[in-house]
From Swiss-Prot:
<feature type="short sequence motif" description="HXTX 2">
    <location>
        <begin position="115"/>
        <end position="118"/>
    </location>
</feature>
<dbReference type="GO" id="GO:0016788">
    <property type="term" value="F:hydrolase activity, acting on ester bonds"/>
</dbReference>
<keyword id="KW-0378">Hydrolase</keyword>
<dbReference type="Pfam" id="PF13563">
    <property type="entry name" value="2_5_RNA_ligase2"/>
</dbReference>
<dbReference type="InterPro" id="IPR009097">
    <property type="entry name" value="Cyclic_Pdiesterase"/>
</dbReference>
<dbReference type="InterPro" id="IPR022932">
    <property type="entry name" value="YjcG"/>
</dbReference>
<feature type="active site" description="Proton donor">
    <location>
        <position position="34"/>
    </location>
</feature>
<feature type="active site" description="Proton acceptor">
    <location>
        <position position="115"/>
    </location>
</feature>
<dbReference type="InterPro" id="IPR050580">
    <property type="entry name" value="2H_phosphoesterase_YjcG-like"/>
</dbReference>
<feature type="short sequence motif" description="HXTX 1">
    <location>
        <begin position="34"/>
        <end position="37"/>
    </location>
</feature>
<protein>
    <recommendedName>
        <fullName>Putative phosphoesterase GWCH70_0799</fullName>
        <ecNumber>3.1.-.-</ecNumber>
    </recommendedName>
</protein>
<comment type="similarity">
    <text>Belongs to the 2H phosphoesterase superfamily. YjcG family.</text>
</comment>
Length: 173
């Protein structure tokens, strides 16, 4: 089965992101606005049990996660992805590192750029027009997130939560 690890921002940020995603993101119906912490990976039932145990340990040792969204940005020319930029911070960086070491070790395909995608798979002309307008807008959200999620992919391509991990020394619900 295919799994991934992400955190979901507040409803306020999700609503803001979705106001763009419904028009510009081909994955709009597959997953809510999120910040990917670990790209999709394959794991069998036994392996996922080990991973869940490790994720509980990581969560217990992770502080609440500050999120500061500051602007629209893009991965152009690598891809026509438009996103909300999340300012890197020590807690987020450390969490990302821990999710790519030990039994979770892998070769990450990309450098970690914390972001929330709002547009993808746009033709070049549409990308240029949309990004040209968005990058002029002021964006500012600040909050803390107290959980991250192990997700799994359903047959229709959508993602759903397998387990939620509370950070900051909070007890699991």
């Amino acid at each position: 089965m295919k799994y991934g690890i992400a955190l979901f921002p507040s409803k306020r940020i999700q609503d803001f992101a979705n106001s763009y995603r419904k028009r510009y993101d081909s994955h709009y119906a597959l997953i809510p606005p999120h910040l990917t912490l670990k790209e999709p990976f394959e794991a069998d039932d036994q392996k996922i049990k080990e991973i869940v145990k490790e994720l509980r340990k990581i969560a217990a040792e992770t502080d609440v996660i500050p999120l500061k969204v500051t602007k629209f940005s893009s991965f152009y020319p690598t891809s026509n992805v438009i996103y909300l930029k999340v300012e890197p911070n020590e807690t987020l960086e450390r969490l990302h590192e821990r999710l790519h070491s030990g039994i979770l070790a892998d070769k990450s395909e990309y450098v970690f750029v914390p972001h929330i995608t709002i547009g993808r798979d746009l033709p070049n002309a549409e990308y240029a027009d949309v990004y040209g307008q968005l990058r002029m807008q002021n964006v500012h959200f600040e909050e803390t997130v107290d959980r991250f999620h192990l997700l799994y992919q359903l047959e229709n391509g959508s993602w759903t939560v397998y387990e939620t991990f509370l950070v900051g020394g909070k007890e699991q619900e």
